[in-house]
Amino acid sequence: MEGPKKVNQIIIKTSQPKDIEQLLAHGAKADKVYIGQNGYAFETISPEGDHFLLHAEEDVSHLELTDLPSLTKDDAFKGLSDFTFEKIVLNVLDQENSRDFYLKIFEGEFPIELDFVQMQGPDLALEPHIAWDLEILEVGVPKDFDLAKLKSQLEAKGVSIYLDTKETVLVLSDPSLIEIWFMK
């Protein structure tokens, strides 16, 4: 890697605040611990430098930095029982271009919230298979979803599309060369 990665932060939300406490009690690596209205949250940085925030709040802006608490382990705890990927923050070469792409193509209906931070670095423009970084955003669609129709709609917006012959996978790339796969 040379310069910043495409992934700035991935924000994960759980509906089970007690799961966060148990992850911390069982020794989950927490680089920063926060407290909010619903309980604890924490940020961890992967060995590859990816930032993950796990929380159970309605609004993460209310989280306050705190010290790692002393928590009691529940031996029956099996892991995070419920979660959603709430938001992905991407480092991009052109913030406005990236934001405009997603608004134009998906008209505000992309299934996960995306945010963009303008950065500089050669790896931000690399093909996905060259660097260890975010390669694909996968979007599941129902079996009866008409990918051929979606292909036509996206091509009408000037987007280059790949659709497999069985019409089960449609692929396009965003300005950062992150592939977006619609899969049945």
Feature locations, PLM:
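Core segments of cupin and vicinal oxygen chelate
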Residues: 1, 83, 88-123
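N-terminal beta-strand motif that seeds the catalytic metal site of vicinal oxygen chelate
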Residues: 7-10, 59-99, 134-137
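A contiguous, low-structure linker/loop signature
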Residues: 49-59
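DNA polymerase sliding clamps and clamp-related checkpoint/processivity subunits
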Residues: 1-6, 13-14
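Vicinal oxygen chelate
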Residues: 11-51, 93-97, 121, 137-184
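Short, flexible, solvent-exposed loop/turn segments with mixed acidic/basic and small polar residues
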Residues: 1-2, 75-79, 125-129
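Acidic/His-leaning functional-site neighborhoods
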Residues: 110-139, 147-150
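N-terminal secretory/membrane-targeting helices
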Residues: 11, 25, 65-78, 113-117, ...
